[in-house]
Curated annotation (Swiss-Prot), chains A, B, C, D:
InterPro entries: AdoMet_synthase_2_family (IPR027790), AdoMet_synthase_3 (IPR042544), S-AdoMet_synthetase_arc (IPR002795). Belongs to the AdoMet synthase 2 family. NCBIfam families: PRK04439.1-3, PRK04439.1-5. This is S-adenosylmethionine synthase. Its cofactor is Mg(2+). GO terms for biological process: one-carbon metabolic process; S-adenosylmethionine biosynthetic process. HAMAP family: S_AdoMet_synth2 (MF_00136). It comes from the Archaea. It catalyses: L-methionine + ATP + H2O = S-adenosyl-L-methionine + phosphate + diphosphate. Pathway: Amino-acid biosynthesis; S-adenosyl-L-methionine biosynthesis; S-adenosyl-L-methionine from L-methionine: step 1/1. ATP binds at G136, T137, G138, S139, S140, D141.
């Protein structure tokens, strides 16, 4: 059956030429990101458990972790968590299959604790965290849906959106958090995983406001703190030059009051230890960013089952489509994908697959159009590839 | 101090002329909307309690309700909830003020139960719901921030977005849910508050897919069910003619299987009774819609304190600004507002207040620009009016 | 099959002649008693639900309610609960029977809330209490056990104990709480349901220490409070004369400090509102008392299923046996019953039914022995009568 | 001030001469014992934390752990926990002292997890357990009470009871559990910590019914299981000969059905993994036993603060007194101690310290009386020694 693919030319100021652009990324230790990470870790663990015990992924959605902040008393050279952070894993999972009972809650709990241990390296799981779990069973037996001999049908009437390529600012914001945590942190362990990078481009001026929960035990005193944030600033300024020729100003922890030594210190690297709650789906979209100048979906990508949940698959898929179109069709300036499902229809047959394309100046939209259609159609023909990539952990969801 | 207001002309296909447009609204009984509603009801109740006991609103944010679905056994003519829906109110609140202890948790609990009783009229609060509450104290004493003799300073570096006017599709989607619940429901009590209206405009064709959890006890049998959904369809089709001349097709509960009598029935009017979890900030934006063709903010508006939380105030404010610009500047076709705060700066002095305007064909952007600037500047001068409107319950947040 | 009934003469100073006797009763509003009451109310409601839906009582045990105290700010003439009391219903219940799903959690929740509303008349269930529920399924399907065509088999190797008659002090302590709450409270609503009556008999002197959480809203001021406790004292002194000719001294709220107005006030009538946690099985035994001069069982009677749970049935049964022996065999001074079950054996065939009897002076033990055996044997032959009395609510469990 | 010590002669059949005697011990892995152990571990950790941070023990009571059973699928050679056991630590603790905030919840959580890891060696804390914690603050600031320059005053009007010496049956029951777990288990790791030893002496015949949750992964098959329980039986029979010359019959897991291979297997060593809930204070008294032929107190000893909580101190103290009297006064056959406090009076001045003594045949009660009084008075003079022993972990509480 032919797919309903609609590629149209978008008449719009391309993002780089718009006057104001806003981009945000929450670091992996932000309470909302921790929630996303836990939700996705649990879903992946369930997928593996289901495959191992039942030969196929069974119905589940674990996209609702709630984090209730603790209390802490951070200090230079030490500090402690006073009241543990409470983390509640929430969702649905199939608990029985052909007479076999499945250890869904235990698997979820273990996966969550493992994820946290790997991600939040300064969190003491024995005393800083209460990990709770409420997994219900689903609304019905979707076993048939999950059979792999045909394309699954959509769980809902819902949509996903994606765009490409990243703007300069998007690249800077994304990589600032990534490089601070994967590169600079290796020699400056005081950098906390809870980070918020807010980028504002006003014409040709870029301002990066970084809020980073520094880890007290690695910092001797205020001087040391000032030196570190200064080094971070220089690091980010240098990093930005790889992505832009615009002026970039970097501001770190602007809420600090150095006179009163009231600075952004943490014990564990996340503000969830002290007053900041978190939940799934309220932070980064699946491309790793929050981009109010771009179309976005409200659907949480993390934690949903990767078999038939449109809120996950179509967000990931549209992002892959957009990136491939940009890669394979050089005349594309900006592309926006929107995929809309209809409940109970095969997921390779969306109600509409819409692409809006801004061609580069001087290029023909018609050529672009047909090439983009091919990319979209190919991806839809291979939609279950997204499922496999998710299970293998090859696609980020936040 | 002069404000940093940037009004630019946006070169873009106006929304009504884009080929594909998607708009969604989750009804007030959708698990995500219930979460939003509870969060906001709690915040309003705390505001009133603080004013009554302390003369001023104190620091709080209660924007993190988590709903864990129950289990139910719906039936024509009856049905019952088997396992109660678990609702966890989460957030921060000031519990002591000048030596007086405040009943924050009790106030929150009562407000939440009252809200639910009023909103979900078929839910039996004695047996269908477990209402739990975990309110911590905040990260620091923000009392100074909340003094009313000067403009509060921003709690965070964050942004809000808004647009106006509503497109035809936006109007249809929004009013479909509103009128079904406020008008048709008065004579057809079987309509559940949990509704999802998904609108797709493909050129001149509009498809409305409505998913509505019907309430079993008001429906005798399958025939009766079919008659009711048919009546709803006719009602919505007629309603749509008030907003558009385009073709409108309405689809209700397309997931139903009439042969097996497997239809979307509920006991209480919400799918939270059976398998659908919910949380704050994952549904409608503060204008009541999810609009992937429009800029959106990821910030949850519901439950945040209305004094200095940018994630609430700037989303509400930018929407008001956009609506007033459209009202006062007739040459404006579409306007998009983005307000970006800087932590610890007065909220009437955003880092940038950006407006992107598509003028109507044949009008002068320059005239529009200056008039829009006046509207924006006026609103910023009167920013605390938003606070007052929130406390009085005059602004919806979802 | 002949039953293993062992009646022996006990050579022991009868209770009334022992020098020191201690007796305690916790009022129905004591946090431990509330837990007991909730547990039993839930079990009764489940019994009724099972009978109504399945024709027979199914396996359940709900004997583990946990109460976590709230915070309150009591005052003369008013006061309020600041943080709700958290009550967690815990236990096991059969959730499915021959394909029918049963509303166990909803039934439990409703029963608990109803019980609380009736028992704690000054508690506002909308804001003073969070009622939570965690009912698992049992360790195995005990359906066969619950068939009514034969005597059920014991769920465990366990025992129950009972004695009769009540001593003077036991009568006084028991009736003090009962009459204060059922009689005096009707004209003095300030008496809280949370009461602890501690009786000490030292030879011929009886001291009753009563700790009673008075309800602030019914008391204007300290003078009024003093008058009320004085009236209570007089009331109890008069009451005691119905049971003893010994000297009785009554002390009420001896922890009060009248100079600092630091007295035992509550908002709701129970100290669970402020600092006193509670759980099942830690207060009164099933005869309503705690009696360290008498044999006791550690088994919680409340909340266990009345079909085959020895910890419930044998405690109730041995108390009934003891009372009937005293009633029917006038030569008995004191009798102590101990019933020991063996797991998986019919409950009318205890491993041993032991009676220790102190005959009245000058009477023949042999006559007493055979008459007591008959009472015991009769009760064992009609053991399921206990089950029926429990379900009908005719037997107290605390 | 002279103390109110009352030593009386008890005319009573000594325990060894009573016809029927019942004694029970719950093993350290029984759900009720785990609750006791967690509660006491938390209290000890808080004592140490308070001393380390504040120089003195501050007010706390953590005597209310609630265990909600999980689900498991035990097997010979393996098995797994399907749903984690939920453990809720409940109590009160001082969270602030002279401006210093104390990490009470974190300390509690860590202590609980450590205790569990050491006690339940086959429990995987990463996936088998959810450890939750709700510690409130107390009803008032008892700091003054806790000053060490004078004897603390009683927190309540309450009592403790103790007796000595152990009867033969008490010794057998107590040591059966102890030796199985500390000696035989070292070469038979399949013995689970969840054990219930029920002893019945009927005249000269002793029956020990042992219910022991065997650990599947150490047992190959049913034959192996049968061999092990047989070896346990022989071990206990031999052990009993050290304490009695009476006939002892040992029954292990009499609920097993060998034909259907339905035997008492566990994954973790405790039935809390599958259907058995638990809570503090419902199992062993502080002497390690449940003894319905002896006076008992209902007060939970575990988890209460060891400074002024009568429910803890007087139970431990009366047991120490009884044991010392037996040791130092050889003419004592049986001694029963009851200590009754009065709220707000120094704990070395009980309202009454009652001893009931059965002297050995042919000995003078008068001599015994005065010697016993000395022991009692000495202990009361040194009552705070109990506190120190508790903090140092030298006294068991269950």
């Amino acid at each position: 059956m032919a797919r309903n693919i609609k590629v149209e030319e978008l008449l719009q100021t391309p993002i780089e030429k718009q006057r104001i652009e806003l981009v945000e990324r929450k670091g992996i230790g932000h309470p909302d990101s921790i929630s996303d990470g836990l939700a996705e870790a649990v879903s992946r663990a369930l997928c593996r458990e289901y495959i191992s015990k039942c030969g196929t992924v069974l119905h589940h959605n674990t996209d609702e972790t709630q984090i209730v902040a603790g209390r802490s008393s951070p200090k230079f050279g030490g500090g402690e968590v006073l009241q543990p952070i409470y983390m509640l894993l929430v969702g649905r999972a199939t608990k029985e299959f052909e007479g076999v009972e499945l250890a869904t809650e235990s698997v979820a709990l273990q996966a969550a604790r493992n994820y946290l241990r790997k991600t939040m390296v300064n969190m003491d799981l024995e005393r800083d965290v209460i990990m709770d779990c409420k997994l219900g069973t689903g609304s019905s037996d979707l076993r048939d849906v999950f059979k792999r001999d045909r394309v699954p049908v959509a769980n809902d009437t819902s949509f996903g959106v994606g765009h490409a390529p990243f703007s300069e600012l998007e690249n800077i914001v994304y990589n600032t958090e990534r490089r601070l945590l994967t590169d600079l942190k290796s020699r400056m362990p005081a950098i906390g995983e809870d980070m918020k990078v807010m980028g504002l481009r006003d014409g040709e001026d870029i301002a990066l406001t970084i809020c980073s929960g520094m880890i007290g035990k690695y910092i001797d005193d205020l001087d040391s703190y000032i030196n570190m944030t200064q080094e971070m600033k220089i690091y980010v300024e240098e990093l930005a030059t790889h992505y832009t020729e615009r002026d970039v100003n970097v501001y770190i922890n602007t809420g600090d009051n150095l006179k009163t030594s009231c600075v952004f210190l943490t014990v564990t690297g996340t503000s969830a230890e002290m007053g900041d709650d978190g939940s799934v789906g309220r932070g980064n979209r699946c491309n790793g960013l929050i981009t109010p100048n771009r179309p976005m979906s409200m659907e949480a990508t993390s934690g949903k089952n990767p078999i038939n949940h449109i809120g996950k698959i179509y967000n990931l898929l549209s992002t892959q489509m957009a990136r491939d179109i940009v890669k394979q069709v050089p005349e594309v300036q900006d592309v926006y994908i929107r995929l809309l499902s209809q409940i109970a229809k095969p997921i390779d047959q969306p109600l509409v697959a819409s692409a809006q394309i801004i061609p580069k100046e001087g290029t023909s939209f018609e050529k672009v159009k047909s090439e983009a259609e091919v990319v979209i159609d190919d991806w839809l023909s291979n939609v279950t590839k997204i499922t496999e990539m998710v299970i293998r952990g090859e696609l980020n969801t936040f």
